[in-house]
């Protein structure tokens, strides 16, 4: 695009190319800047929507499946902005999430890798609409033991599942614990997770200092599972108490208490709750509780009949190790020894066996998907092969039913005579292949079939299709000097005929009356002459500029000409209907009737009708921006009889804004405004920080008053949405007024966007308490 240079007077360049690219003109010649089109981005089969937040490696946007309309979360990973260590961490997260399948873990649905084209990798993950557990805590100040026990059991189940598969999370905190629409926990963000290698210690410093175990803060080598147990204990303390266990006047004092596990027991909790917290928040990892102890703790199973499920599927023993899966297992860091193979074959209850079975399940699912795609490709190839062997009917022509077998036999005889013996053999081979294809898994009963056999099957079908195309093309190599005859002959070879010609008469049909054929030829010539006259009159009217007559004489002559045209067309229709009503036993069923210039039945519309419809559509008045009525000129003339007609769909005119408003967009615009005039509806009250019986309008007034008194920087993002920022603490969050579904209540939802979590909690608590609800 050319750069816009400014002249000495500061005017922007108005070159024709610039104006054409960036502006459009109205009737008065004024420049109207073009509106930017909202381009919809697609990633795979998902439509990208609004931004949900920022993840560890990039933005997270809402996605919608084009077919199922299911919502997903799409993580954008810009590979060129990641360091070598970050790339390793990122793709390790992808490998780990591919292996996990647990109801309380966010599921990775798909990976769209476009590193070579766009330098971006897209992770399609499960969309969790309930927000963070931390926001849920802020909304209630703290959570009662009964509800906290439900969350705890779900977290134990997910963590045990990870540890059993030799995966440690290492970054458990309330911000990475999400709530779905049913209020269940979903563990997310496995960016800092790692594989637990038997006999090896981890040494990476990672996680949040407030939730990290003492061995990580002291930069010691550590085991994986005890680290997650410590973080789980700190999370449960925050859930039950609404604040962290570490207190102090300075950051150094807080860090000291965190490393040594110094905290006071909350007085409002039961003895069982205090005890289970003390078993998890233990500085020495060797003395810290295990998952099995927590599952069987009395507090965990109050009001429950059984301990939390791990959702580990039963594993059958394997009798043979697949080398490709074993190589993948070794790439994850497991030892390549005979002992590892023996453990897998013995099916011992250990992490190596679980990881091997996870990889085995993953490879099996891939093979199933490949098999499905191969079967779909096979069915498509077979369909295209049958379509080429048996050409279907045209929208303007149909093959007579009585001549199907006869015409196909004639075509086959011609192909066998003109083709060499090798091609004849290939055709017989293809027929045998088609018989064998009827027993394929795509049509008959499901049989065991390998991918190699499917590939050979598809390759054979391709050869058959190519041979059939060569046979068809060789039968049409001879062409006469007349191009119209060439077209007619090629159509007759397939049983199809031009819409200007009479019904085709194959040479082998002796039942067809020759006198009837001559009568139809004469009738065809008469129709052609009448159509030529109408075309000449119509073209002369176009050339004489009949745009809207201004004088009365011109209006009268114009109306007379239109009446004459209509009378001639009506006469043609009546004459054609009389001819059609005459009984004729020699005519075949479903033969191609010669259509008149204005046919009533849409299924037998001639080509001239399509051009006529095109002209009528283009001549309809279009409401412009100034309200004037305009006429569009014809860009193409009607085809003559000698020309082979090219069938085109009628061009639909682009509707102006006024005409769209008249056609119903105005009502949708009103409905949209009505939707914006009311607050969003929220399912349940657990997402709201507080509720009130006041109307949304009165709640807005009270919220504005509290925001003015708080001194927060506030920006209104919508009728019921506010963006708030605390400059002192660098905390950014949003407040939204919602309607509670099925309840006559108004809710206030708070969501942290950035900044320290516990400073955000203090600000929100103070703000909600100042509101008189």
Swiss-Prot record:
Name the SUPFAM superfamilies on file: KA1-like, Protein kinase-like (PK-like)
GO-annotated cellular components: cytoplasm
Q: Where is the active site?
A: 171
Q: Which residues form a coiled coil?
A: 362-390, 445-474
Domain KA1 per the UniProt entry, residue ranges? 724-773
Which reaction equations make up its catalytic activity? Answer: L-seryl-[protein] + ATP = O-phospho-L-seryl-[protein] + ADP + H(+); L-threonyl-[protein] + ATP = O-phospho-L-threonyl-[protein] + ADP + H(+)
Region annotation Disordered: where it falls in the sequence:
1-32, 382-445, 462-487, 558-588
Q: Tell me which domain of life the UniProt entry assigns to the organism this sequence originates from.
A: Eukaryota
InterPro entries in the cross-refs: KA1/Ssp2_C (IPR028375), KA1_dom (IPR001772), Kinase-like_dom_sf (IPR011009), Prot_kinase_dom (IPR000719), Protein_kinase_ATP_BS (IPR017441), Ser/Thr_kinase_AS (IPR008271)
One Gene Ontology biological process: intracellular signal transduction
The entry's ATP-binding residues are: 52-60, 75
| Biased amino acid composition, Polar residues | 1-27, 468-478
CDD domains in alphabetical order: MARK_C_like (cd12121), STKc_AMPK-like (cd14003)
Q: Which intervals hold domain Protein kinase?
A: 46-300
* Comp. bias intervals (Low complexity): 405-443, 561-573
The entry's keywords: ATP-binding, Coiled coil, Kinase, Nucleotide-binding, Serine/threonine-protein kinase, Transferase
Entry annotated with the keyword Transferase: yes
Family membership, please give it: Belongs to the protein kinase superfamily. CAMK Ser/Thr protein kinase family. SNF1 subfamily.
Identify this protein by name.
Probable serine/threonine-protein kinase MARK-C
Recorded source organism is Dictyostelium discoideum
